[in-house]
């Protein structure tokens, strides 16, 4: 195989293996795909591990983008620096990093994590701390972190910040996190900080939540956004209403209470770049969101360095690219609960 060399880089292959959308929008493995371009504000990363998210199978089905590489969350090794990144001295070739990219992107089709090499925005890439392995770093990723940044701070408008939570900055606010999940995951969500968990299978789940919150629940994030989850969320919201943050597009006819204000959040908008998706998911470039996102990621880096950013329990799926295809099907058919699927692509631990 021929090899090429970028500025500030090690010797690299001319082509790589990726999972991309074919001409019909279906995900397929291609073994002779070119390496992505190294833009001035980017890092070229050799991917060692990837995490699989529900959006990874949904993107190709809902937003066909023939030729686009799929996948978002990754961990790996820096092998080349963009010219602007090189000047800052913030990253070095050989460093271990993790983050999230916009996979299946019709505007930037080579930027997806299901690849041996990817191009990552340096401002939205974490340095992996010494105590953490790359397998766990892939579970940190960046997709969920970016989504929660927009959901908590922008959509719900919660006070405080990740490193200065409410209570430390303003005694007027008391935020009590609760969760809705399967009973088998009660201990897991409580270990992450939920003070109370409720069984979504229970026919009295909404009433139980209203009783526990004294009918004052005012902020809800719904990551599933199906008819039954929206009905539960709207029924559980307190008498005075509040903000409902949907991580999927919602049906207007299910917005049954005027005092509840719904909003759709698309996590990749935090990059500040145009999101060229339809069905309500798209957005124009937004410098304000990018500035917020950069600050949010810097705070997350501080939490990561301090060991205060927890990941889901990891479940490794073997088989490299075949393993990714298997993992996507596992998520699509709802075979995964309370775990993050991870696939090893490289040789590092």
UniProtKB/Swiss-Prot annotation:
It comes from the Eukaryota. Keywords: NADP, Nucleotide-binding, Oxidoreductase, Virulence. Substrate binds at residues 143-150, 267-271. Its EC number is 1.-.-.-. One of its GO terms (molecular function) is nucleotide binding. Pathway: Mycotoxin biosynthesis. It is an enzyme of class 1 (oxidoreductase). NADP(+) binds at residues 55-58, 182-185, 200, 247-248, 336-337. InterPro entries: ADH-like_N, GroES-like_sf, NAD(P)-bd_dom_sf, PKS_ER, Trans-enoyl_RdTase-like. Monomer. Belongs to the zinc-containing alcohol dehydrogenase family. Trans-enoyl reductase; part of the gene cluster that mediates the biosynthesis of the mycotoxins phomacins, leucine-derived cytochalasans with potent actin polymerization-inhibitory activities and monocot-specific antigerminative activities. The first step in the pathway is catalyzed by the hybrid PKS-NRPS phmA, assisted by the enoyl reductase phmE, that are responsible for fusion of the leucine precursor and the polyketide backbone to produce a 2-pyrrolidone intermediate. This is Trans-enoyl reductase phmE. The gene is phmE.
């Amino acid at each position: 195989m021929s090899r090429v060399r970028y500025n500030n880089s090690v010797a690299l292959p001319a082509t790589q293996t990726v999972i991309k959308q074919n001409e019909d929008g279906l995900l397929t493995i291609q073994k002779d795909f070119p390496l992505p371009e190294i833009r001035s504000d980017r890092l070229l990363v050799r991917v060692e591990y990837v995490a699989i998210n529900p959006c990874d199978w949904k993107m190709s089905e809902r937003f066909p983008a023939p030729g686009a590489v799929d996948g978002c969350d990754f961990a790996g090794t820096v092998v080349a620096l963009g010219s602007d990144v090189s000047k800052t001295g913030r990253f070095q070739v050989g460093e271990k990093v993790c983050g999230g990219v916009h996979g299946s992107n019709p505007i930037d089709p080579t930027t997806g994590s299901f690849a041996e090499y990817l191009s990552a925005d340096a401002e939205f890439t974490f340095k992996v701390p010494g105590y953490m392995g790359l397998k766990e770093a892939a579970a940190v990723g960046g997709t969920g972190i970016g989504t929660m940044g927009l959901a908590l701070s922008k959509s719900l408008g919660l006070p405080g910040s990740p490193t200065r939570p409410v209570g430390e900055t303003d005694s007027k606010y008391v935020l009590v996190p609760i969760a809705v999940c399967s009973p088998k995951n009660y201990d897991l969500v409580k270990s992450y900080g939920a003070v109370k968990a409720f069984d979504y299978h229970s026919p009295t789940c909404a009433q139980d939540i209203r009783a526990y919150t004294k009918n004052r629940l005012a902020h809800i994030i719904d990551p599933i956004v199906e008819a039954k989850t929206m009905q539960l969320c709207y029924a559980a919201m307190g008498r005075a209403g509040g903000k409902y943050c949907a991580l999927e597009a919602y049906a207007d006819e299910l917005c049954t209470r005027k005092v509840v204000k719904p909003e759709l959040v698309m996590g990749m908008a935090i990059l500040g770049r145009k999101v060229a998706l339809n069905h309500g998911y798209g957005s124009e470039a937004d410098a304000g969101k990018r500035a917020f996102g950069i600050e949010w990621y810097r705070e997350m880096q501080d939490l990561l360095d301090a060991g205060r950013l927890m990941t889901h329990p990891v479940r490794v799926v073997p088989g490299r690219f075949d393993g990714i295809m298997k993992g996507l099907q596992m998520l699509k058919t709802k075979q995964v609960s309370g775990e993050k699927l991870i696939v090893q692509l490289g040789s590092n631990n």
